[in-house]
Structure formats: structure tokens, C-alpha cells
């Protein structure tokens, strides 16, 4: 019988075959006609890649059926994509394939539109314009596919240089996730990033929705100088709060961070260090407060009376 083989260039090759011919035989016939080595050929029928040892009749390929010929580049390899349902999809890819290409292959196999796909490898969400080799994804690596809920949105991040970065995010993304996306785009390590929205520094473990950050919101990125440090604040109940600060932060800034974490208005806070009450306009470095120093927080009661500190 006759079958047709269509190439990516649109050329159609006619082959004389038997239903009992193996896919290997068919590739040999294509080599005879077109000079393409069998190991560089991938044959597709009804959306499936055909295996060398199987026959045309195994795949119900009948007279005048059309196969599609795709060339396997030298670097061709298989990777796996695992879905949340536990299903594993096998893909034929090249190291030079972009994440966008991979999403298109998943759409071909599973019908999931690329804009609803998020691909994760080694804990990182993969960006469309980057390649598999950029992420060191090698043969037989497993990617994880997470569906992007309709809530997916764009936000903007403005740097001190005036540059604006566009990010694809979910309301459920944590600030930590957002910093990882900025690292992917700009190469800035998360521990050097401070993100500000509506005048507040954003905490790693909180989500965008926690801060009411919506589509097309703009965050401000400030680089944390190497002087960034942790200090502790001990309350009268004995609870210890950890804060990320800079030596140049004012006491007012520190009180704002405490308000973010604990909900205590700054005007009800008194901070004590080395027996001294700290003044709002002064900085941590003014008081020689260094990394891992402990401040004591005393609440200023409404009537102007103070709760006594217990040190």
C-alpha cells in the first residue's frame, strides 16, 4: 500500500509499504529517498510518536495514511513532566528548547493551554524565555506541572535605577517566591532584596494577597546592603521577635517593623537598649546596636502610664 510522510518543510514523500513493515523499515525507506539517517527521524501518527520495533498495523496505519516526520537534533533527549494528579508525561526535547516550547509540547499531548501551565524544577518556577540548558535540565530530568489558576496576574517591580521588571505571579505566591523570580530575571540574590509596597517592607513568609497586592501593582526593590542584620526584640510576655534591619534604620523604622509583625502601633511602643529608651529619629548605629543585639519592648498604656519592664 501507499502511505504519505509529511515533513516540517511541507514536503510530502510517498512510500510503498506493507502493513507488516516495522517503523524501523519505514525510516530506512525515508533514508533511501531523502538521505536522513533513521536515528535523526521521529515519526508521528495521530499525535503519537511511533516506536521502531512496532509495525504499521500495530498503529492501525492504513493505505493513504499520513505520517509526520520531525527531525531529532543531535542533542535530543527525553524528560518527564509530573502532574499534580500523579500522571507522568514523557516529552522529546532538545537542551536548546525554551520553556515556552516545552509548554507547547505539553499542550499538544494534554490539551492544557500554555498560559495555565507553571513548570517547576529544583524548586524554581521556570520562565518562558529561558532554555532547558539554562536550568541544567538534562535527560530524564523530571519537571513538575502546576496549573495556574485563573488568578494568575502581572505585577511590576521598580528598582532604584528606575528599571521596571514585569513578573507573572499568583496571589498565593509568597514574597520568597517573588524574590526567586527576581533572581531568575535579574540575578540578584534574595537575601540582598528588600521589597516595599505601600510604604511597608514585605516579609518572606507572607503572600501577595496578604498585602492586598493586586494585578498591575508596583513593588519597589531596594538592595539590602551587606550591612543587613538580624536583631531581637523581647516583649514583656517573654516572646522574642526577630527583625531584619540595617544599621541605618531609624528607631521609627524598627517600630514600624514591629507593628507589621505584631500589630502594636508605634505610639504605644517604647524600645529599651542597654538601659536607655531609644529616640525615634536616631538610628540603630547611633546606639551601637549590632547584629543579634536584643532590644526590650515596653508598652506605653493609653493613660501615659508604662508597664514596668522586666529584664
Curated annotation (Swiss-Prot):
For the site Interacts with activating enzyme, which positions are given? Answer: 54, 72
What SUPFAM superfamilies does the entry give? Ubiquitin-like (SSF54236)
- The Ubiquitin-like domain extends over 1-76, 77-152, 153-228, 229-304
Which named protein is this? Polyubiquitin-B
Q: Which UniProt keywords apply?
A: ADP-ribosylation, Cytoplasm, Isopeptide bond, Membrane, Mitochondrion, Mitochondrion outer membrane, Nucleus, Phosphoprotein, Repeat, Ubl conjugation
Chain positions found as Phosphoserine: 65, 141
As for family, the record states:
Belongs to the ubiquitin family.
Residues with the modification ADP-ribosylglycine, per the entry, are 76
How does this protein assemble?
A: Interacts with SKP1-KMD2A and SKP1-KMD2B complexes.
For the cross-link Glycyl lysine isopeptide (Gly-Lys) (interchain with K-? in acceptor proteins), list the residue numbers.
76
Amino acid at each position: 500500500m501507499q502511505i504519505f510522510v509529511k515533513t516540517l518543510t511541507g514536503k510530502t514523500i510517498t512510500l510503498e509499504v506493507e502493513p507488516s513493515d516495522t517503523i524501523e523499515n519505514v525510516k530506512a525507506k525515508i533514508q533511501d529517498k531523502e538521505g536522513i539517517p533513521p536515528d535523526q527521524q521521529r515519526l508521528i501518527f495521530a499525535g503519537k510518536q511511533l516506536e521502531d520495533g512496532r509495525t504499521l498495523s500495530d498503529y492501525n496505519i492504513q493505505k493513504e495514511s499520513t505520517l509526520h516526520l520531525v527531525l531529532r537534533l543531535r542533542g535530543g533527549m527525553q524528560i518527564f513532566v509530573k502532574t499534580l494528579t500523579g500522571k507522568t508525561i514523557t516529552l522529546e526535547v532538545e537542551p536548546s528548547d525554551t520553556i515556552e516550547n516545552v509548554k507547547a509540547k505539553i499542550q499538544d499531548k494534554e490539551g492544557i493551554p500554555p498560559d495555565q501551565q507553571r513548570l517547576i524544577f529544583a524548586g524554581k518556577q521556570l520562565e518562558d524565555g529561558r532554555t532547558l540548558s539554562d536550568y541544567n535540565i538534562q535527560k530524564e530530568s523530571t519537571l513538575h506541572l502546576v496549573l495556574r489558576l485563573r488568578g494568575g496576574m502581572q505585577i511590576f517591580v521598580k528598582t532604584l535605577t528606575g528599571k521596571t521588571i514585569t513578573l507573572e505571579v499568583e496571589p498565593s505566591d509568597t514574597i520568597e517566591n517573588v524574590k526567586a523570580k527576581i533572581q531568575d530575571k535579574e540575578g540578584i540574590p534574595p537575601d540582598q532584596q528588600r521589597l516595599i509596597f505601600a510604604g511597608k517592607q514585605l516579609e518572606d513568609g507572607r503572600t501577595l494577597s496578604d498585602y492586598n497586592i493586586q494585578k498591575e501593582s508596583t513593588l519597589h526593590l531596594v538592595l539590602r546592603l551587606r550591612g543587613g542584620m538580624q536583631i531581637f526584640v523581647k516583649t514583656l510576655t517573654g516572646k522574642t521577635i526577630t527583625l531584619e534591619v540595617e544599621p541605618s534604620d531609624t528607631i521609627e523604622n524598627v517600630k514600624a517593623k514591629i507593628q507589621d509583625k505584631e500589630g502594636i502601633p508605634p505610639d504605644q511602643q517604647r524600645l529599651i537598649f542597654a538601659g536607655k529608651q531609644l529616640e525615634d529619629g536616631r538610628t540603630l548605629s547611633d546606639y551601637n546596636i549590632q547584629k543579634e543585639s536584643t532590644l526590650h519592648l515596653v508598652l506605653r498604656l493609653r493613660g501615659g502610664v508604662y508597664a514596668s519592664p522586666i529584664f
